[in-house]
A protein has these predicted regions:
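Aromatic-rich, lipid-facing transmembrane alpha helices and their immediate juxtamembrane interface loops
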Residues: 1-174
Length: 174
């Protein structure tokens, strides 16, 4: 695949993973999302020049997601559908989604360009809550806290998580 089509294919692939995770969870299934994320990550890594360094960024994304989503659950702001392996921790499908999101970090960094931290913070603050809103509409999660507080918490998590993951990946590559 030529370089100019890779970001489009990556974006489309991630959207497919997101949709598979959300729709699968809404039906009470973790497996479709986990499998889709695994296939997406595997395909993306097969096209990378140094897949081992990308794996670290992907794992970091999964760890951040596990902590963030578990915190939202413990704070009783969000309840996820298909809560496996525990109803108190982030489910497998949402962690798989965060792992797949880690694949998109290099493209996102190049698209944001200069002032990466500020732009990523703004993108996270806006796009994070929109994704949760869409997921809730599909039945993948339920907002259990007050809507303004829950969306503010999600916006703040993403406003910190996205720039942090991009900075981590940048520093890893130096």
């Amino acid at each position: 695949m030529t370089m100019r089509w890779r970001p489009i294919a990556e974006w489309a692939g991630f959207q497919l993973v997101w949709l598979t995770c959300a729709l699968g969870a809404a039906q009470g299934w973790n497996a479709p999302g986990v499998i889709a994320a695994g296939l997406f990550i595997g395909a993306a890594l097969a096209m990378k020049r140094s897949p081992s360094s990308e794996c670290i960024a992907i794992l970091a994304s999964g760890a951040v997601g596990f902590i963030a989503e578990s915190a939202l659950m413990v704070a009783e702001l969000v309840r996820f559908a298909a809560p496996w392996p525990s109803s108190q921790l982030a489910p497998a499908w949402i962690v798989a989604l965060w792992l797949a999101f880690g694949v998109t970090l290099p493209t996102m960094a190049s698209l944001l360009g200069h002032s990466l931290v500020i732009k990523a913070g703004i993108v996270g603050f806006v796009a994070g809550p929109l994704a949760y809103w869409a997921g809730a509409r599909l039945g993948a999660l339920e907002m259990t806290g007050s809507a303004p507080l829950t969306y503010l918490a999600i916006a703040l998590i993403w406003a910190v998580a996205l720039p942090s993951l991009l900075i981590f990946r940048q520093r890893m590559r130096q």
